[in-house]
Amino acid sequence: MTKTVGVLSATLLILSVTAAFAGENPLLGTWKLKAFVREVAATGERYDERGEHRNGFLGYASDGRMYAIITWDNRANPHDVVPTNEERIKLYGTMISYAGTYTMDAEKVIHHVDISWNQIWTGTDQVRFYKLEGNLLTITSAPNRNPVDGREGRSILVWERVAPP
């Protein structure tokens, strides 16, 4: 009887801690991109290669799944629903998107990528450090090689929480 009560107590404790963490996950929801800055490691140079009117959404769900999609400013529309090869290259080169699962602690979230616009990211873990201030979420990548220009550095993204409809 004592053993059963002990096992039951331990199980309830684990479930309550898990439920409490799930209820307190500050990243849950949808976020809209407000700023995207790239910082070059060698020089400290900071630049925004995505344009003034950046587009992007980031989502974290309670089931542990996430997605990110970002497009550059002023993307050209293809001339037809079936783009030319040149149009495809330009469209591919002006976006970042991936989805997968995530794990987190008090300072970082790790995106475990299941599917990606660039197959080389699929199956990788993308480490992101985060900071919350009100409805703003700042995410800074771990040092990495930029998939657009190849330079080493980090990305600093500011997201604003999207209110439910």
Model-derived segments and their meaning:
Residues 15, 19-165:
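Lipid interaction determinants
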